[in-house]
Amino acid sequence: MLALGKLLELTLAGREPAQKIQLTVDGVQMRWLSEGALEVRPPEARDNGSDLLLSSGIHGNETAPIELLDRLLHGIARGEIKPRSRVLFLFGNTEAMRRGERYLELDVNRLFNGRHEKNIGPEAMRAAELEQLARSFFSLPGRSRLHYDLHTAIRGSKIEQFALYPWKEGRQHSRHQLARLNAAGMQAVLLQNKTSITFTAFTYEQLEAEAFTLELGKARPFGQNQGVNVSRLELRLKQIIEGTEPETDSLDGLKLFAVSREVIKHSDAFLLHLPADVENFSELEKGYLLAEDVAKTRWVIEEEGARIIFPNPKVKNGLRAGILIVPTTDAVLG
């Protein structure tokens, strides 16, 4: 196997490869760009005009997605996967990956769309670098652009595998992309309705990519992800890379949700009235007092069918401590 196929091994060891560019036996170029960043380029005659960005490790302890990208890279380096797409593989927070921690000081996935400019430290610098790597990769005109940012969650979930679809004024959410996610094993998609500061929000809003944050299960250490089943996603990614993806327009069984409200933590007095082990997609009854903060701020459930995702009262002041979502239909899709 080509040495550049061992990007994860190089990254965890903090080493640069001796050779920055290598070719597989069938002419696929693998090019090391910087720590945790590797571009795969098919021979010109096989290039189908699509660009795919695959990122993981934005949170360093979310290892199942990292291992998935590692397997795909190994397959390409061995010549078992024969790309027709350009692919950029990114491991996000490399130092946190080495330490087995979610992040060191700042949550990298809250530092995009310019937010890194308002912060200092290595994680703000890394977010800026990731933006630049993505911007450069998606700079070629006339090509399709797709970004999957792969994660696992801090807590359990009543719907284990789901996607978050960013929002931009004037753009419609794509039925075709949701059918593709359905085929890849996603059980639900959250359609967002405001701008955000995540990596996929940046690539969707600024770089005109179709972009999705994919949540694949519970976060576990390296080598302990037997309980995270990513087989359908892995197959679909191979098909996208190789240009052999079967056409599908089916949304059968895919649950769609819309954001109703975000719960923002304003002060250290913030209280979230949920058990510490509450699962994502837990239902909340109308009238339930969800949270309280200074100045008599109260979040009371008003919505029918409301559910909570990403509840986290420990976030820094000013950040999102949870999202209230409600069921929606495919009538909103383009």
Swiss-Prot record:
Catalytic activity: N-succinyl-L-glutamate + H2O = L-glutamate + succinate
Active-site annotation: 215
Signal peptide per UniProt: none
Naturally occurring in which organism (per UniProt): Pseudomonas fluorescens (strain SBW25)
Top-level taxon: Bacteria
Gene3D superfamilies noted in UniProt: Zn peptidases (3.40.630.10)
SUPFAM superfamilies, per the entry: Zn-dependent exopeptidases
Biological processes annotated in GO: arginine catabolic process to glutamate; arginine catabolic process to succinate
Pathway(s) annotated for this protein in UniProt: Amino-acid degradation; L-arginine degradation via AST pathway; L-glutamate and succinate from L-arginine: step 5/5
Class of this enzyme: hydrolase
GO MF entry, a single one: succinylglutamate desuccinylase activity
PANTHER family the record matches: ASPARTOACYLASE, SUCCINYLGLUTAMATE DESUCCINYLASE
Cofactor or coenzyme needed: Zn(2+)
Role description: Transforms N(2)-succinylglutamate into succinate and glutamate.
Residues annotated to bind Zn(2+): 59, 62, 151
Protein name according to UniProt: Succinylglutamate desuccinylase
Family designation: Belongs to the AspA/AstE family. Succinylglutamate desuccinylase subfamily.
Keywords assigned by UniProt, alphabetized: Arginine metabolism, Hydrolase, Metal-binding, Zinc
Cofactor binding note from Swiss-Prot or TrEMBL: Binds 1 zinc ion per subunit.
EC numbers: 3.5.1.96
InterPro entries: AspA/AstE_fam (IPR050178), AstE_AspA_cat (IPR055438), Aste_AspA_hybrid_dom (IPR007036), SuccinylGlu_desuccinylase (IPR016681)
Record bears the keyword Zinc: yes
Record flagged with keyword Nucleotide-binding: no
